Amino acid sequence: MGKHKDSKRENVLIAAEEVFMKKGLKGARTVEIAQKAGVTHAVLHYWFNTKEELFKVILQRKMMEFRESVLVAFDQAEGPIEKRIEKAVGAHFDFIRSHPGLPRFVVNEVCGNPDTIEPVKEAMASEISDKISNLDIPNAATILSDILSLNLSAFLVAPVIATLGFCSEDEYLDRRRQENIDTILLKLKNSSL
């Protein structure tokens, strides 16, 4: 019985992630999430009292996945700082690519509902700040900001590039991944001169 309950709860989380990624907090409806998950609306609200509570769980999961993908890649990479940053930039890009709705979701929620991400932001900011302060590179916070903006913007622009017929989204993203790594490494090299 416990495993069945756990799998149903996980189905709710999967459905909620899909709906929140497409519609954001304000546009999402718990009735739709319950239907997608194959549970009653009452069961959904038994597990998660409010839509905001469910949203926070999804947001925390996505941020933890993000954290794991980037910080673990950075920590596990061996060698000089350039090699470690190259791995972290690539891991961040790959993480976003495997979660295609995430860039738009992040931009919409950060701009439209900044209060909803505040608790998660504070927890991650302190860990990232600790990681940055341990790096022996000038302007580490700026470089981190550049990594985030370059990688996120690539996924926001990719559909436009494909629609205009310049190349497919996949071709564009394959090229941008390496260009973003090269750009960050060049900036790192120039900041250490």
Model features per residue range: what roles?
Residues 94, 126-137, 150-193:
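C-terminal peripheral helix-coil segments that are non-catalytic and often amphipathic
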Residues 30, 60-66:
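Short, basic, alpha-helical segments at the C-terminal edge of helix-turn-helix-like DNA-binding modules
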Residues 11, 15, 19-53, 57:
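Helix-turn-helix
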Residues 1-7, 193:
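N-terminal intrinsically disordered/low-complexity leader segments
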Residues 89-92, 106-109, 147, 151, ...:
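Short alpha-helical scaffolding segments that buttress acidic/His motifs in well-ordered protein cores
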Residues 53, 94-130, 166-171:
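Short secondary-structure transition hinges
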Residues 64-71, 111-142, 174-178, 182:
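Amphipathic alpha-helical packing segments from all-alpha helical-bundle domains
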Residues 57, 72-98, 137-147:
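Hydrophobic alpha-helical connector segments
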